[in-house]
Amino acid sequence: MRPSLQPLGLRCRLSVLCAGALLGLLSGCSLLPQAEPNDVYLLPGGVSPQASGGPAVDWSLRVAKPQANQVLDNSRIAVLPHGSLISSYKGARWSDAGPVLLRDRLLETFQADGRISSLSSDDRQLQADLELVSDLRAFQSEYRAGQPEVVIRLDVRLVQSASHKIVAMRRFEVRQAASSARVADVVAAFGQASNALAGQLLTWTLQQGQLQARNLR
């Protein structure tokens, strides 16, 4: 006796019906987690282009992106809610990695001042007399007595490009209280702290760069 065979067309129709039923069962659920929407923040409070009026220096400077650990070298907005626990603000992120934002703020500040006219970044490996290299140790908000405070800590080295010799080094730390625990207010405090640190670093770099230039004469 021959085995009973279903016509090919019937088998195809049954397969389509089964697939459709399966898709209908799955349509009410998601097999993959939905991406959480993020608010993307620029680092606020950029300086207005305003020259210092002081004489231009005769040396060039390259500003390198600060080195940082994996917690800080990303676009998450870091927060220490208590103790040594580090987290990030849910549903919010920076427009770029923290070290890039800080380097660009330094460049903006130096360019607006105008005294270091021969200025470049490590994005373009142009020749420069001195290089500003650094390690970003903190770029986060920390809660103090229930209120957020932004902390930026940067270990800086001024290096002779030709000899790779460190000619000056210093730690900079700025703290800026946020006006509230709202993410937008914490972000505003990041901008204020970054501006303050950039101003301090500009003054120090000019002093150390001029001292180094005199020593080379």
What is the predicted role of each segment?
Residues 85-93, 162-203:
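Short secondary-structure boundary motifs at beta->alpha junctions and helix caps
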Residues 30-99, 208-217:
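A structural "domain/chain start" motif
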Residues 25-28:
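C-terminal motif of bacterial Sec signal peptides marking the signal peptidase cleavage site
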Residues 32-50, 57, 108, 113-163, ...:
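Surface-exposed short loop/turn segments
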Residues 2-18:
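Bacterial N-terminal signal peptides that target proteins for export
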Residues 99, 103-107, 113, 194, ...:
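Extracytoplasmic/secreted envelope proteins and their assembly/folding machinery
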Residues 66, 135-139, 173:
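Generic short beta-strand segments
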Residues 112-119, 203-217:
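Surface-exposed helix-capping loop/turn segments at secondary-structure junctions
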